[in-house]
From Swiss-Prot:
Primary role: Involved in ubiquitin-mediated protein degradation. Regulatory factor in the ubiquitin/proteasome pathway that controls the turnover of proteasome substrates. Targets proteasomes to the nucleus and facilitates the degradation of nuclear proteins.
Gene3D superfamilies documented for this protein: Tethering factor for nuclear proteasome Cut8/Sts1
Lineage per the UniProt record: Eukaryota, Fungi, Dikarya, Ascomycota, Pezizomycotina
Subcellular location: Cytoplasm; Nucleus
Keywords on record: Cytoplasm, Nucleus, Protein transport, Transport
Name of this protein: Tethering factor for nuclear proteasome STS1
Region ranges (Disordered): 1-84
Subunit annotation: Binds the proteasome.
Signal peptide: none
PANTHER family attached to this UniProt entry: FI02826P
């Protein structure tokens, strides 16, 4: 008996409406496509699929064109070059700059004249500092031990001594009238130059002291010319303002300065000691006090003992004046020279 066996019913698939993978076909049409199909190609996108997929054409995210970057590429062939003039000047010290400027002035005289007119006038402190440097070099060149006044010491320091005296002879005319119109500037320089002359070394051999004698005599001449100029200007100024009785004493300035020069010449020839007394008016109007500064006996402006020099005692009896021994340090002073042989 032919009976049909009832097949149990197949329950429907849970995702009935979901897409099923297409059956794989080996037809020639499918092989010509040669690509794997995806589920998204046949199935309508669900809500979950739409949320997980990234938007392809969002209107809020338009691609912005980037500006081209101009990169400075290193040059393949970099060659060296010398420094510019300002940078080169920054690397030079004072001595190197002085050497370069001196060589330029020697090769080009027109540059030398331009430098002379452009450079500022040297001050008294700058000139005395240069002279002090020469003197320090002289003192440091003495040999250690032994007699500092011997011929051996003289030969060791002779060149440095010559450099100091040459610098002194070059600087001094610059601060003298008529090149220097201010008497106070001239006297201030001469005061410092006199101290340098006083510190010159003294030698055992008399021939070696000729340079010191010449510098001393030149210093007295410079004091004479400067004192005459300063005295005349001061006298004219006081007569125009409020003349005083002691102004007339300035008329004897030139004579006493000449006596100082003669004394220095005798000092150089016969080893006389010259004592210079500077008299000026006391601020209180009277007084007979003595002020002095210690120095070596062989110096031109040396200290004195008034108890053994009666000629100085007579000067002390003059009222309204004070006696000072200080190597022409005061500007408004009168000079009296007392040679002691």
């Amino acid at each position: 008996m032919n009976s049909l066996i009832a097949t149990p019913p197949v329950p429907p698939h849970f995702y009935e409406t979901s897409c099923r993978s297409p059956s794989y076909s080996m037809s020639s049409t499918n092989t010509s496509v040669n690509r794997k199909r995806k589920a998204e190609d046949d199935c309508p996108p669900s809500g979950d699929t739409r949320m997980s997929a990234s938007p392809s054409g969002s209107p809020a995210l338009h691609p912005r064109p980037l500006a081209p970057r101009h990169l400075k590429r290193p040059r393949p062939n970099v060659s060296g070059r010398p420094l510019s003039l300002p940078r080169l000047m920054e690397t030079l010290d004072t001595d190197a700059l002085r050497s370069v400027l001196r060589s330029l002035c020697d090769r080009h005289p027109e540059i030398a004249s331009e430098v002379m007119h452009t450079a500022p006038r040297p001050s008294v402190s700058a000139a005395l500092e240069v002279l002090s440097n020469y003197q320090s070099t002289l003192q440091s060149s003495f040999p250690l031990g032994g007699n500092p006044s011997s011929d051996y010491a003289y030969n060791r320091v002779r060149q440095h001594l010559t450099n100091l005296l040459e610098a002194l002879n070059d600087f001094t005319p610059h601060f003298l009238p008529p090149n220097e119109s201010q008497p106070s500037t001239s006297l201030s320089y001469l005061d410092g130059a006199t101290d340098i002359i006083h510190r010159l070394p003294r030698w055992t051999t008399p021939q070696h002291n000729i340079e010191e004698y010449a510098a001393t005599e030149a210093g007295t001449k410079n004091w004479q010319s400067t004192n005459e100029t300063a005295g005349g200007k001061l006298q004219d100024a006081l007569k125009r303002a409020q003349p005083e009785p002691w102004v007339d004493r300035w008329q004897t300035w030139a004579t006493r300065a000449t006596a100082l020069r003669e004394t220095s010449r005798r000092y150089a020839n016969s080893s006389c000691r010259a004592h210079t007394v500077l008299a000026y008016r006391s601020k209180s109007g009277h007084g007979n006090s003595i002020q002095y500064q210690s120095s070596k006996p062989h110096f031109l402006f040396s200290t004195f003992n008034p108890s053994i020099h009666p000629s100085i005692t007579a000067l002390l009896s003059t009222p309204h004046y004070t006696v000072q021994v200080d190597g022409f340090r005061a500007i408004f002073n009168e000079t009296i020279t007392i040679p002691i042989c």
